[in-house]
């Protein structure tokens, strides 16, 4: 980071702001996650992640992704087998950290993907990456005919009382292992 114009005092300030433990991660872990998710400039985040993959995993991020994530054909297979596939964004951005224009581009790209795999693009569901959204996100979901938005608020939804664009959910980690 130091060679990319981010000083030690910046790092210290970032640590104070972002190293806040949550229900899943300790302070150090969440600090690294936040730096690589949205705090550092995107190009620097990508470079750090790529170097970490090569050093600790022994593969490039792209090679690892091919093993970890479903292929387009596998997603099409889910849809063809009757599974519902909704949106999680195109680039997995914290939507509340990007401009409304960038949000719209990301949502449209995601809808194009859903269309390509045969998933519905009217009355569709958005599961916000990291649970992050804002008023611009909600407006865009309505503009593009979404029916539901799912947050990371950890509780059971009350479909009669909760805003359909701000539904809570339980994470798999919320259940006994």
Question: What is each of the regions a protein language model found here?
Answer:
Residues 1-81:
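Extended, charge-rich helix/loop segments that form flexible
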Residues 9-10, 22, 47, 80, ...:
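C-terminal active-site subregion of NodB/CE4 polysaccharide deacetylases
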Residues 15, 19, 35, 58-61, ...:
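A near-ubiquitous, low-amplitude feature marking generic local secondary-structure context
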Residues 52-53, 91-95, 116:
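Conserved SAM-binding loop
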Residues 53, 86-89, 124-130:
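Short beta-strand segments
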Residues 66, 91, 163-166:
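Glycine-rich, flexible loop/turn motifs
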Residues 71-75, 79-102:
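Histidine/lysine/aspartate-rich catalytic loop segments that bind and position anionic ligands
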